């Protein structure tokens, strides 16, 4: 008889997910303290890590990890690779335990085995972690690292993710390291091991790594020898060239569109390497693959300097000159023409020489010399005149009588002397003190007083100490200040120290009779005193409200009758004072009181404001 309740038992052959979290790898300082103070604890911790990875490598345990444990494992791998890669070149401890070293070596091996089993995508190793992986393992395992990067080493676990080529990521990461200034010698050694280390199999990784994109990255870093990472770019391209074959180099040049020297000039770093004799020795098949490199006749001295060929012709080939101007637009036409003359109109040889050492063309001046050397009358100075003729190197007609021996032997030394002279000139000009303009005032022309605003006073006006002298000085200063204020509003740079000696500054000094220091000090006073600047702005912005028109008397400042004018004014003042002190009648008092009431607006605060402005003007004049 069947039971009242039927039980259904479901049997599932699958395994449950494994939850086995792991902590991050300890940082450098903590590891150093554990080794120094408590190495036993550090040893047990490493043994635990080793046991953990041994368990993951058994069967399909790594595939059964749940999401949380897998995330912890990925975080541990990133921290471990970062710490071990950063430990290169550092002293962890003076005396490390042998057991600790052995367990660390085992842990390093188990981790690399796990990475090869799972692949880079499953463990999410990319960017900094990928480069740290290369730094840690490429020296002893170059083949495995290359297989992980290019995707040829397939993972042994069941994963649906496609293994992609990560060479481009490595190139971009190297570019970021160089641009940020974090590229070190150990990184350069890792690149060398990655590309050129001996392997059990044919090294196809270096061939695939050397791409047109890699050349463009290095060219951008080199920046015609002026970039921040030009040294690193030069070292990287040398390692890359020595790691590939001539056939691969030929393929890359075709991709870049390089077929002659004109197109090679678009890639100056690659062009510098391709015409180098050291590269030709390492790659003897290079000239047979790249036919435009077969120039021939390249004569080099045993020293560091090139030998200059003799020039049999005196006229420049215009077609070759135009081709050089298109190829090297940074140089002038005169420089290129003189270089062609020096190399007997051999455009291929000139192009090669400029690629090898651009200073040979920079030794020539950009324009022909305008000044001609006067002939020396003495007959013993014939050799000196010959040297001067070589130095001038003007038009081709001037060089017809030059001796070939003088050109071939004297030109290199002369070029070196010119380069050295130019370098010393730039060096001393950069540190030279500013020009002393103390005695420039003696050169100012003061003969024409009509061109200046501030006029000189006569000897009589200096002797007489009455009020008219102060009024005249205030009036002159007011006009000078208005003139300078208009210039300051138009262009404040006219008051800078660098404008000394210019035509504009000379005009300012003539119009104001002020020195350079006084003009510049007036501007600095306004910069440091905004209140003073606002007062001047009010003063000269609304000056149109002042009354204009004919006056009863115009001062003749240039005449010698100023003393008589002053005396007449003094007499008028005395007569007015006498009239004021005379007794007035009642009717006159009423009339005067009515006038005062009617014009009291012009007598009270307004007069005080004018007096205050005069006082500020005098204070500013004294400050300057």
From Swiss-Prot:
Gene this chain is encoded by: CUE3
Function: Involved in activation of the ribosome quality control (RQC) pathway, a pathway that degrades nascent peptide chains during problematic translation. Specifically recognizes and binds RPS20/uS10 ubiquitinated by HEL2, promoting recruitment of the RQT (ribosome quality control trigger) complex on stalled ribosomes, followed by disassembly of stalled ribosomes.
Disruption phenotype: Defective activation of the ribosome quality control (RQC) pathway. Mildly defective ribosome stalling induced by RNA arrest sequences. Sensitive to anisomycin (stalls ribosomes in the rotated state).
Key words, A-Z: Cytoplasm, Phosphoprotein
Assembly behavior: Component of the RQT (ribosome quality control trigger) complex, composed of SLH1, CUE3, and RQT4. Interacts with ubiquitin; the interaction is direct. Interacts with SLH1. Interacts with RQT4. Interacts with HEL2. Associates with translating ribosomes.
Any Pfam family hit: CUE
Biased composition (Basic and acidic residues): 443-455, 568-589
Organism: Saccharomyces cerevisiae (strain ATCC 204508 / S288c)
Name of the protein: RQC trigger complex subunit CUE3
């Amino acid at each position: 008889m069947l039971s009242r309740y039927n039980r259904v038992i479901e049997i599932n052959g699958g395994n449950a997910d494994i939850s086995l979290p792991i902590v991050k790898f300890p940082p450098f300082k903590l590891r150093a303290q554990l080794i120094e103070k408590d190495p036993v604890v550090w040893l047990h911790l490493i043994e635990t890590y080793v046991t953990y990875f041994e368990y993951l490598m058994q069967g399909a345990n790594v595939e059964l990890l749940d999401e949380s444990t897998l995330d912890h494992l990925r975080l541990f791998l990133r921290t471990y690779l970062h710490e071990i890669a950063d430990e290169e070149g550092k002293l962890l401890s003076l005396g490390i335990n042998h057991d600790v070293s052995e367990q660390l070596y085992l842990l390093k091996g188990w981790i690399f085995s796990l990475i090869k089993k799972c692949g880079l995508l499953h463990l999410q190793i990319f960017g900094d972690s990928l480069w740290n992986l290369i730094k840690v393992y490429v020296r002893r395992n170059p083949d495995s690292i290359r297989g992980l990067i290019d995707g040829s080493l397939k993972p042994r676990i069941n994963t649906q993710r496609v293994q992609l080529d990560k060479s481009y990521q490595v190139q971009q990461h190297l570019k970021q390291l160089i641009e940020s200034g974090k590229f070190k010698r150990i990184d350069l050694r890792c690149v060398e091991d990655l590309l050129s280390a001996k392997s059990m199999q044919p090294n196809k990784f270096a061939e695939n790594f050397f791409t047109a994109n890699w050349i463009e990255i290095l060219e951008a870093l080199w920046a015609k020898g002026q970039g921040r990472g030009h040294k690193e770019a030069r070292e990287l391209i040398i390692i890359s060239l020595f790691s590939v074959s001539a056939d691969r180099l030929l393929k890359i040049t075709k991709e870049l569109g390089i077929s002659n020297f004109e197109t090679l000039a678009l890639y100056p770093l690659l062009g510098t390497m391709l015409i180098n004799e050291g590269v030709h020795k390492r790659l003897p098949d290079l000239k047979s693959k790249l036919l435009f490199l077969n120039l021939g006749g390249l004569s080099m001295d045993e020293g560091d300097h090139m030998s200059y060929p003799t020039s049999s012709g005196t006229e420049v080939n215009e077609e070759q000159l135009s081709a050089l101007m298109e190829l090297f637009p940074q140089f002038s036409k005169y420089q290129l023409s003189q270089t062609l003359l020096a190399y007997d109109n051999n455009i291929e040889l000139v192009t090669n020489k400029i690629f090898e050492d651009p200073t040979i063309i920079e030794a020539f001046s950009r324009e022909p010399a305008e000044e001609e050397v006067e002939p020396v009358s003495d007959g013993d100075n014939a050799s000196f005149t010959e040297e001067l003729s070589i130095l001038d190197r003007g038009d081709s007609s001037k060089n017809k009588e030059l001796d070939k021996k003088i050109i071939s032997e004297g030109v290199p030394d002369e070029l070196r002397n010119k380069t050295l002279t130019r370098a010393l000139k730039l060096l001393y000009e950069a540190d030279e003190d500013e020009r002393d303009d103390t005695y420039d005032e003696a050169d100012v022309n003061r003969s024409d007083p009509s061109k200046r605003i501030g006029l000189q006073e006569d000897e009589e006006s200096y002797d007489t100490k009455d009020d008219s002298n102060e009024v005249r000085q205030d009036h002159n200063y007011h006009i000078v200040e208005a003139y300078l204020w208009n210039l300051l509003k138009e262009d404040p740079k006219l008051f800078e120290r660098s404008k000394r000696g210019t035509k504009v500054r000379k005009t300012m000094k003539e119009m104001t009779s002020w020195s350079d220091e006084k003009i510049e000090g007036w501007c600095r006073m306004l910069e440091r005193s905004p209140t003073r600047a606002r007062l001047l702005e009010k003063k000269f912005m609304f000056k149109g409200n002042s009354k204009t028109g004919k006056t009863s008397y115009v001062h003749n400042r240039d005449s010698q009758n100023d003393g008589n004018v002053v005396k007449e004014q003094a007499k008028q003042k005395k007569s007015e004072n006498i009239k004021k002190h005379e007794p007035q009648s009642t009717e006159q008092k009423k009339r005067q009181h009515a006038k005062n009431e009617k014009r009291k607006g012009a007598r009270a605060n307004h007069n005080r404001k004018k007096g205050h402005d005069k006082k500020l003007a005098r204070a500013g004049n004294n400050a300057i």
